[in-house]
From Swiss-Prot:
One of its GO terms (molecular function) is rRNA (cytosine-N4-)-methyltransferase activity. The lineage of its organism: Bacteria, Pseudomonadati, Pseudomonadota, Betaproteobacteria, Burkholderiales. It is found in: Cytoplasm. InterPro entries: RsmH, SAM-dep_MeTrfase_MraW_recog, SAM-dependent_MTases_sf. This is Ribosomal RNA small subunit methyltransferase H. It comes from Burkholderia cenocepacia (strain HI2424).
Length: 313
């Protein structure tokens, strides 16, 4: 219960107000978490409205199953499965899709989940601990090159190569020291390599982010769900995405811009602008948490919300 109480949904009112344009529509919450956005959406829906939520985390599913509302259903899967999951439920078009990306406070705050370097725990990092390869299992087999690429590309860590070498060197000592399987030891290894310090940021922050993104295929799944959302949105439907770091936000920004712009055509070709297909999206706005929200919930500081609307059938 403590974790449930500590979780604060970021940009709650702003997201739901931007999302729900038709109270009798069908909406998707791609990241149920602990249900903050879902409950607020349900409060705005009419009796004919419908909300379908997704989450990989078994604990989120347990929370969702406690919502007794005929308009609500939960899917225990990644939002990357959205297109097929909705088709299986007879849903062809939706009035809005909400994505609240990243890891939730209850996941970070529970040492047993292995997301945080602040308290020692098993090196897991999976959103769904029942599926796929854990962080410890991946670290036990990844090459220096693969480690470097993941830590560099997903963590934007300039010491990626040095960290990768240190991790492989530690693996060579597994017969004597045992496997690298705790968050505390991983943070310690990274801390010994990263000599410079960013103000207010633990030296392991970027590496933990990178490994978590890789283990959960977060950026690949994000691209899949953005494409799915575009195809599922009815005319006038909204796509609302809240991201918490530059890698996510860059993907969302480029996706929305690409689909809100007319196709590029060589000016030498005899094609009139009026003959080109209209872009499917219109960018509505970009919003940030208020100073008051950041003061009450420091984890909201890095959040950015982007909103786009489908303008073509």
């Amino acid at each position: 219960m403590g974790n449930e109480l500590r979780h604060r949904t970021v940009l709650l009112d702003e997201a739901v107000e931007s999302l729900v344009t038709r109270p009798d529509g069908v909406y998707v919450d791609g990241t149920f978490g602990r249900g903050g956005h879902s409950r607020a959406v349900l409060a705005r829906l009419a009796s004919a409205g419908r909300l379908i939520a997704f989450d990989k985390d078994p604990r989120a599913i347990e929370t969702a199953q406690g919502i007794e509302d005929a308009r609500f259903s939960i899917v225990h899967d990644s939002f990357a499965s959205m297109r097929d999951a909705l088709a299986a439920r007879g849903v062809e078009k939706v009035s809005g899709v909400l994505l609240d990306l990243g890891v939730s406070s209850p996941q970070v705050d529970d040492p047993a989940r292995g997301f945080s370097f602040r308290a020692d725990g098993p090196l897991d990092m999976r959103m769904d601990p029942t599926r796929g390869e854990s962080a410890a299992e991946w670290l036990a087999r990844a090459s220096v090159q693969e480690l470097t690429e993941v830590i560099r590309d997903y963590g934007e860590e300039r010491f990626a190569f040095q960290i990768a070498k240190a991790l492989v060197a530690r693996r060579a000592e597994s017969d004597r020291l045992g496997p690298l399987d705790t968050t505390g030891e991983l943070a310690q290894i990274v801390g010994h390599v990263v000599k410079t310090r960013e103000k207010g940021k633990d030296p392991a922050t970027r590496t933990f982010q990178a490994i978590r993104i890789h283990v959960n295929q977060e950026l690949a799944d994000l691209q899949v769900v953005l494409d799915a959302a575009l195809s599922l949105l009815e005319q006038g439907g909204r796509l609302v995405v809240i991201s918490f770091h530059s890698l996510e936000d860059r993907i969302v920004k480029r996706f929305m811009q690409a689909h809100a712009s007319a196709p590029a055509v060589d000016r030498r070709l005899p094609i009139r602008a009026v003959d080109l297909p209209s872009p499917p999206l219109k960018i509505i706005s970009r919003q940030f948490p208020s100073e008051a929200e950041v003061a009450a919930n420091p984890r909201a500081r890095s959040a950015v919300m982007r909103i786009a609307e489908r303008v073509t059938p």
